[in-house]
Amino acid sequence: MSEAMMWLLVRGVWETLAMTFVSGFFGFVIGLPVGVLLYVTRPGQIMENARLYRSLSAVVNIFRSIPFIILLVWMIPFTRIIVGTSIGLQAAIVPLTVGAAPFIARIVENALLEIPAGLIEASRAMGATPLQIVRKILLPEALPGLVNAATITLITLVGYSAMGGAVGAGGLGQIGYQYGYIGYNATVMNTVLVLLVVLVYLIQLSGDRIVRAVTHK
């Protein structure tokens, strides 16, 4: 493998990490409040609102059901409006964020559902407002689950970013497609595969350690 290809792979790793973590951050900025809203508006919860819950849940389910490669192509006009181009690192972050947000929202909702109902009832009995319950009970108690959700999301985004590489998003996916598949270079393809596996392993390892650190003893 040439030195130029090695540097290209290094840049591909950097671009993949940038796409993954930036879109993961914005995905959480959108998905976390949506997930909390899904939980608190569920039937029997502290801000029960069946109509809002059904509407929000339907939107989340619709976006979760769209395969990422279809979402990527469908969002090209919107991506051009937002960042001025439909190819490259910045352009990839837009559909990655949109793809991650509903996924995060549903995982956040499920993490909150694991909290014992008795804690919430005790807080309500002491006069806590819904906002106080969310800030002081729900989010702290669900922190291990939320960290696990972040780990799963980042791993999913690594795979999404690789798919995006096939349509010019950059990163390891584009290198594997352009030089490995189109260029019939098995060495490049295998190297990209190994690098993606290593990235996923490191993200999972880091996530597991953080979960252990924040889990209540």
From Swiss-Prot:
The keyword NADP does not apply. Residues 41-67, 114-151, 207-217 are cytoplasmic. Pfam families: BPD_transp_1 (PF00528). It is found in: Cell inner membrane. Coiled coil: none annotated. Residues 1-19, 89-92, 173-185 are periplasmic. The keyword Oxidoreductase does not apply. CDD domains: TM_PBP2 (cd06261). It is a multi-pass membrane protein. Residues 13-204 form the ABC transmembrane type-1 domain. Its main location: membrane. PROSITE patterns: ABC_TM1 (PS50928). Keywords: Amino-acid transport, Cell inner membrane, Cell membrane, Membrane, Transmembrane, Transmembrane helix, Transport. Part of the binding-protein-dependent transport system for D-methionine and the toxic methionine analog alpha-methyl-methionine. Probably responsible for the translocation of the substrate across the membrane. This is D-methionine transport system permease protein MetI. The gene is metI.
